[in-house]
């Protein structure tokens, strides 16, 4: 068995390969056919045109940075104070301009000379000095309830409108009352909560204990312990 290939078979294989290449290039929108033979004068003119094209492209690329730097210069000129563009509008300016869609509302910002602590003190003063207002709230049943806003230093009976005058409040004698205390313990696997009253003059201890009055003015029973066993 001979594996020798004749010249005709080689030519046939080459032609088949060329046809396949031509078909593929045709599908891709190209062609493998060599350009037709042109005279030497036309070839030289084409080469000169190609050289001129390369030269013009190189000069354009060299001039591109100069053109690109011109917007930067105009941008810097607009950012300088007191300078605007020819149409009177600019995106960067030291003063607000009419027609700027990016401008927000004209809000008063805090003075830069004030520190953070100074702003906190101002806020506390406003909160303490502003008048308190009664608020009305509606519960789920549709009933309106009056609620009172707490203000530091005000008496609860004055805030609730019980009719006491300022002089009566100042001359009121403090009456000692009871202090409600609680104890939480774990007994026989169950949590036990105990509560009782101690007189206000008795010291507060970490251990649950029932104390006696030491000033002689505390009541024996108050509204908190009247139902205690």
From Swiss-Prot:
Disulfide bridge positions per record: none
Bias kind Low complexity: ranges: 59-71
GO biological process: symbiont-mediated suppression of host cytoplasmic pattern recognition receptor signaling pathway via inhibition of MDA-5 activity; symbiont-mediated suppression of host JAK-STAT cascade via inhibition of STAT1 activity; symbiont-mediated suppression of host type I interferon-mediated signaling pathway
Start and end residues of each stretch annotated as Disordered: 28-115
Positions bound to Zn(2+) 2: 201, 213, 215, 218
Pfam families noted in UniProt: zf-Paramyx-P (PF13008)
Start-end of Basic and acidic residues biased regions: 45-55
Keywords: Host-virus interaction, Inhibition of host innate immune response by virus, Inhibition of host interferon signaling pathway by virus, Inhibition of host MDA5 by virus, Inhibition of host RLR pathway by virus, Inhibition of host STAT1 by virus, Interferon antiviral system evasion, Metal-binding, Viral immunoevasion, Zinc
Residues that, per the record, bind Zn(2+) 1: 178, 197, 222, 225
Compositionally skewed regions (Polar residues) per UniProt: 82-97, 105-115
Keyword Zinc annotated: yes
Record-given protein name: Non-structural protein V
Natural source organism: Human parainfluenza 4b virus (strain 68-333)
Gene designation: P/V
């Amino acid at each position: 068995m001979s594996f020798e290939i004749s010249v005709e078979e080689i030519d046939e294989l080459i032609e088949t390969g060329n046809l396949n290449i031509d078909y593929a290039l045709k599908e891709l929108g190209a062609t493998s056919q060599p350009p037709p033979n042109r005279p030497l004068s036309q070839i030289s003119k084409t080469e000169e045109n190609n050289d001129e094209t390369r030269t013009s492209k190189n000069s354009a690329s060299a001039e591109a940075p100069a053109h690109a730097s011109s917007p930067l210069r105009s941008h810097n000129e607009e950012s300088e104070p007191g300078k605007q563009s020819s149409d009177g509008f600019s995106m960067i300016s030291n003063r607000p301009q009419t027609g700027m869609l990016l401008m927000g509302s004209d809000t008063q910002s805090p003075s830069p000379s004030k520190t953070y602590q100074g702003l906190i003190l101002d806020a506390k003063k406003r909160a303490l000095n502003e008048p308190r207002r009664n608020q009305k709230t509606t519960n789920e049943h549709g009933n309106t309830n009056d609620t009172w806003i707490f203000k530091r230093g005000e008496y609860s009976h004055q805030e609730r409108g019980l009719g006491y005058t300022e002089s009566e409040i100042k001359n009121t004698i403090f009456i000692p009352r009871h202090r409600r205390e609680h104890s939480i313990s774990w007994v026989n696997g169950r949590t036990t909560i105990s509560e009782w009253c101690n007189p206000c003059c008795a010291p507060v201890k970490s251990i649950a204990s029932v104390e006696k009055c030491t000033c002689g003015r505390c009541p024996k029973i108050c509204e908190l312990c009247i139902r205690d066993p």
